[in-house]
């Protein structure tokens, strides 16, 4: 749990290091944003916010949780683990026009490749594959693990319905939960 929390915090801090300075430089444009939350990383103090608990669609930010849980399960064993692509990994995305790496049913993919594809190409089929890996069987099992992690972290305004972030009514988070 500590490794997952540390990895998740590192990813969020890196995202914040890129996004927050740009937002600060933008000045008044931030006031036109639907929701934002700027938190002191050392103290947890909310420095500025607007609608910080409003439940919004997280899109591909969802993959931060997906990647975090996959990394936690792997515990550094990146190269030896092979994942087998299932029918669900590929065909659950049919008709979504989502980003993918064209995985083929039955294909064996090294864990490290699935991690890179999900992180760098925002591959939704890669996110599905990772969810099956850390969930222990199906994408639904992976999503259940994601929501268990949400509960453990005390994220009151977050719920996942998939591992990739494709829009769904029951898939939401708040900027405070993400901070």
Feature map (PLM): residue ranges:
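Sec-dependent N-terminal signal peptides of Gram-positive bacterial secreted proteins and lipoproteins
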Residues: 4-24
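Acidic, His- and aromatic-enriched active-site or binding-groove loops in soluble protein domains
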Residues: 179
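Active-site-adjacent loops and short helices of periplasmic peptidoglycan-processing enzymes
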Residues: 25-176
